[in-house]
Amino acid sequence: MRRGLYVGRFQPFHNGHKAVIDGLAEEVDELIIGIGSADISHDIRHPFTAGERVLMITRALNGLKIPFYVIPLEDVKRNALWVAHVKSMVPPFDTVYTSNPLVIQLFKEAGIPVLSPPMYLRESLSGTAVRKKMYHGEAWEEYVPKEVVSVVGEIHGIERMQQISKSD
């Protein structure tokens, strides 16, 4: 059995993430989705809580053809210890999938195979681009699964984002 670990912040979970996961479902038998920076929320780069991101991802992946686990991963203040922390928090895995340069380096140094899945429409489908649209009141809904639109509405996410982006 092949089990992969896909690590990202998912702020928010968007169609690019979904496309990567759909592709990974063809490569692995089970997928662990590690929500990075799970301890940070309510700021410009991290507007959503770990629990809100779990909800977004779980709903958006309902019907995925392989079993998956969504696990929040808190940051640690020493990067050299982060891989050991991750390994203690998730089921055993064979390969890490990420495009984050730091995450790639840390897992490679630990001797764990790392693959960078191809990014899907990276110019328009990045968390930064989607958040920018959300902050500025622009159309963002087409860039995320419909289930994410629902979660953002339930938690009043746009209002939160616009409030925390104000300066005093």
From Swiss-Prot:
Keywords from the UniProt entry: ATP-binding, Cytoplasm, NAD, Nucleotide-binding, Nucleotidyltransferase, Pyridine nucleotide biosynthesis, Transferase
Q: Which pathway is recorded for this entry?
A: Cofactor biosynthesis; NAD(+) biosynthesis; NAD(+) from nicotinamide D-ribonucleotide: step 1/1
Q: Tell me yes or no: is Cell membrane among this UniProt entry's keywords.
A: no
The highest taxon in the source lineage is Archaea
Q: Does the keyword Cell cycle apply?
A: no
Q: Which reaction does it catalyse?
A: beta-nicotinamide D-ribonucleotide + ATP + H(+) = diphosphate + NAD(+)
Q: What is its EC number?
A: 2.7.7.1
The Swiss-Prot or TrEMBL record annotates one GO molecular function as:
ATP binding
Q: Which GO terms describe its biological process?
A: NAD biosynthetic process
Q: Which GO terms describe its cellular component?
A: cytoplasm
The record's subcellular locations are: Cytoplasm
The first-level EC class reads transferase
State the family named in the UniProt similarity comment for this chain: Belongs to the archaeal NMN adenylyltransferase family.
What protein name is recorded for this chain?
Nicotinamide-nucleotide adenylyltransferase
